Amino acid sequence: MKHQQAAAPKFFSKKRCIILSVIALLLIVPIVVITQPKIADKLSFLINSVRLDRSPGESAFPDIDTANLSPTRQKIISLAKTEFKAQSAGTKFSQGAEEAWCANFVSWIMYQAGAPLKNPHTGGWRIPGTFTLREYYEANGQFKPANSGYQPLPGDAAIYRNSPVFGDHTNIVLKNDNGVLTTVGGNEANRIRVFVNRDKQYDGLLGYGVPTDN
């Protein structure tokens, strides 16, 4: 009996330690995330991936009338269709780099279509981040804010920030049917996907990068 009474405090002591440890973790983790941008970026990427996994994708590339589009826009749509069918790995568009590749996909398509972007930091055609991508289009007078009344055309690059559908993302406009956008994007659930925004969920849509038409 004495032995059982002596053991009771140890049990409660262990339980108390576990509770205190859990509380400490709950307090420490948010501080680490806030003070360590790289960790925050990785967590944001994981959250965005979950959002994308839940988004429906189309199994076929849509029919698009390109007759009245500029040659550059026609090339953009043609290249996007080819890559959608090929479903290549993201490293094809990122020059071999293992990284989030939605902006790399847009950069590669524009480069191959004869309307290359120019990274303000490296001078190269590839812009791997959506923030820099937007800055590039703005600096060159090619950015159309979402609230400007501009109606996007096939071949425009849509750019998002904290979108409930895409997170921080960019993809290419394929169609605009009375406000229902059909887009094709890289790194959507780690693949190239066609998405029809039937619910018109455009919260977080910053605007559009307009390609230089040759």
Residue ranges with predicted function:
Residues 18-20, 77, 85, 195-197:
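General helical structural elements
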Residues 116-190:
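...with weaker cross-activation on analogous glycine-rich loops/strands in unrelated enzymes
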Residues 102, 129, 198-199:
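Alpha-helix initiation/capping motif
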Residues 1-73, 210-214:
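Cysteine-nucleophile amide-bond enzymes
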Residues 2, 14-16, 25-41, 147, ...:
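Aromatic- and glycine-rich peptidoglycan recognition patches
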Residues 36-119:
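N-terminal capping segments
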